[in-house]
Each structure stands twice: as C-alpha cells, then as structure tokens.
C-alpha cells in the first residue's frame, strides 16, 4: 500500500532530490502547502504573504520503506532549528514542516522530532522549530512544471546544503 507524506525542508529543488534514490519511494513532486492563498505560484509564495511552505510530496510503498526511514532523510538533510530559513534562503516558505496524512505518520513525526531534538540539544543546538500539521487540512498546490525534478533538468542548479550533521537515532 502506498502512503503520502509532505515535508518542508527549505528550497524544494534540492529537498526533492534527497528522496529520489530511496527504495520504496515511488513518486515525488514539489508544491506549496500550509498557507491561505488558493492556487499560489512561485512568485507569490516568495513574497512571504501567502504563508505557504515549499513542499516535497513523497509517495512511498510502506511495505518497502517505513515512515520513520522517510523522516530520517527529512531530519538529517536540513537544519530544523532555523525557523524561517535554511542556510542563505530566508523566508517563511523555507520553514521546516511535516504534513501528515494519517495518525501513524503523526505519531512517528512527533516521536522522531522528540528524539532528534534530544540529539540536537545535547550538541548545544537550538530547539527544533518544525511544524507538524494535518495534510488533510492544507491543500497541496502543485508547483510550476519548471520546478518539478529541477535538479534533473538543471544538474548544476542550486541545492541548499544546510543541515546539522547529526543523525536520528535508530
């Protein structure tokens, strides 16, 4: 059975790429979610007035990869302590978020947030600012075609490398 999870972890170009090679991930796309404006576009989202987040939609086969393993990639490939930014990318659209489609995902998201937060706290980092939201309450708006699989189309394109360097415990 496939499940869908939505994550915000900074610029969606590089974030989407992190999930391409995971066994069990059957589809990814990028879009906007979590805001108040209907049918937003990139230009509008970048103004910071829509409250939308740049999102990676991940469809995965739960018999091949667990929600925890998908979220391990999420936590370890951005800095969830930075609030409305990732590296040099600043704005509310770059904030850290997990939008869950069911109770199991929400439970795993909350547990891994707590576990990763303990690791980061022990290392002296700031608290995690990641929002955990119900995806069913926030429409996912597919981003423009030129954003989809951006780093395949533009192999030398921008890929934010902000992360903490710490691992989620097993």
Segments (PLM) and residue ranges:
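Flexible coil/turn and secondary-structure edge motifs
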Residues: 1-170
């Amino acid at each position: 059975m496939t499940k869908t999870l939505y994550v915000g972890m900074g610029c969606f170009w590089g974030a989407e790429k992190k999930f391409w090679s995971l066994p069990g991930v059957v589809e990814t796309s990028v879009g906007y979610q979590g805001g108040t404006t209907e049918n937003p576009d990139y230009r509008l989202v970048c103004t910071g007035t829509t409250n939308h987040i740049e999102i990676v939609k991940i469809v995965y086969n739960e018999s091949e990869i667990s929600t925890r393993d998908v979220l391990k990639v999420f936590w370890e490939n951005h800095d969830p302590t930075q609030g409305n930014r990732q590296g040099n990318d600043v704005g509310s659209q770059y904030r850290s978020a997990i939008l869950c489609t069911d109770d199991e995902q929400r439970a795993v998201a909350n547990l891994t947030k707590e576990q990763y937060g303990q690791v980061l706290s022990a290392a002296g980092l700031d608290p995690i600012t990641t929002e955990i939201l119900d995806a069913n309450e926030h429409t996912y708006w597919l981003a423009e075609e030129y954003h989809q699989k951006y780093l395949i189309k533009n192999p030398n394109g921008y890929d934010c490398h902000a992360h903490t360097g710490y691992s989620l415990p097993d």
